[in-house]
């Protein structure tokens, strides 16, 4: 007879979202069980640039960033691990003379986020290292930067484990258990698990977990790639995270003259998370270095690559996360 585990809460997915939810719930003494299809913290949460930003195009995403911001600033105090947070700020750049940046800053200021639209001359005056750039305007927000996502995941994992959270790794969910109209558990490759609440925090797999419950939620995944350019790139440490919204390329300093570069370069079509290639594209690597060089004028298109990786941005069609209880006992927390 297969085992049946009973908990207060089951969380599907042990990425940053699932672990953060487990942390919050376990702080209140609840019995939490996480089901993870691979290893905890080994999915898309590690395949990012570690970005922490407050600049978004919607009130919801701005609010979510505001709510989490203090967590990153005080992470070491609460999780006993330094996330190596570095505040660079963000500078969104465009060569187009439109009012969209003014509209964006109005929204940010409405949400109590200090930001400004800067002209080309103001950008050059503030950061002489960027005087060769050819943008007409930029949005600058001083708050925000990047951290080491691996250390953050480790901090969450160690803390939830010490709180008594159980994690069933290398286990796939293939069915949903119902009692009348309420979701009461999941069927997995390791047996059945039942709980008062099931939370779908499965990242790129969230749509498939939702489908098991009979739901059709428009989750999509977009493939992205990132490179670390070696120190000979000599990228100034004082510059902010630079984002060219026209070319869809971005760059930030990564310490000791290194740079992190990435971007969709106009290609952000949805991909199937089960068939998406995990490797790097040589063509993309060449193109992104060229685009970053032409956009920001602080790196060379022939800069050598120290490290690179690809991953998926789990999201939705409109870039808005889904946080809801679509069925009794079943909560969705995905699309971030």
Spans of model-derived segments:
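Glycine-rich FAD pyrophosphate-binding loop
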Residues: 26-46
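Dinucleotide-binding Rossmann-like beta1-alpha1 core, especially the glycine-rich loop
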Residues: 50-126, 248-250
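Short beta-strand to alpha-helix junction loop
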Residues: 63-64, 92-100, 139-158, 277-283
């Amino acid at each position: 007879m297969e085992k049946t585990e009973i908990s207060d809460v089951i969380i599907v997915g042990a990425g940053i979202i699932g672990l953060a939810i487990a942390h919050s719930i376990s702080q209140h003494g609840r019995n939490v069980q996480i089901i993870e299809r691979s290893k905890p913290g080994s999915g898309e949460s590690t395949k990012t640039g570690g970005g922490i930003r407050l600049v978004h195009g919607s009130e919801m995403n701005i609010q979510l960033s505001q709510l989490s911001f203090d967590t990153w600033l005080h992470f070491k105090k609460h999780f006993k691990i330094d996330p190596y947070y570095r505040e660079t700020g963000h500078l969104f750049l465009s060569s187009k003379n439109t009012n969209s940046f003014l509209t964006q800053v109005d929204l940010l200021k409405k949400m109590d986020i200090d930001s400004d639209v800067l002209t080309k001359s103001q950008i050059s005056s503030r950061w002489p290292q960027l005087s060769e750039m050819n943008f007409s305007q930029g949005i600058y927000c001083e708050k925000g930067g990047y951290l080491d996502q691996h250390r953050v995941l480790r901090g969450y994992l160690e803390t939830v484990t010490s709180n008594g959270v159980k994690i069933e790794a290398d286990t796939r969910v293939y069915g949903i258990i119902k009692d009348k109209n309420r979701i009461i558990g999941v069927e997995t490759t390791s047996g059945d698990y039942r709980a008062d609440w099931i939370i779908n925090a499965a990242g790129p797999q969230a749509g498939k977990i939702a489908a098991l419950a009979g739901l059709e939620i428009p989750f999509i995944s977009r493939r992205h790639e990132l490179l670390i350019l070696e120190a000979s790139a000599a990228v100034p440490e004082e510059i902010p995270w630079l984002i060219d919204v026209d070319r869809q390329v971005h760059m930030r300093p990564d310490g000791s003259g290194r740079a992190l570069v990435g971007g969709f370069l106009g290609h952000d079509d949805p991909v199937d998370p089960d068939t998406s290639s995990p490797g790097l594209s040589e063509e993309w690597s060449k193109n992104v270095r060229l685009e970053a060089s032409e956009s920001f004028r602080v790196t060379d298109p022939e800069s050598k690559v120290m490290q690179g990786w690809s991953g998926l941005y789990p999201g939705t069609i409109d870039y808005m996360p889904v946080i809801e209880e679509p069925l009794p006992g079943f909560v969705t927390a995905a699309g971030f």
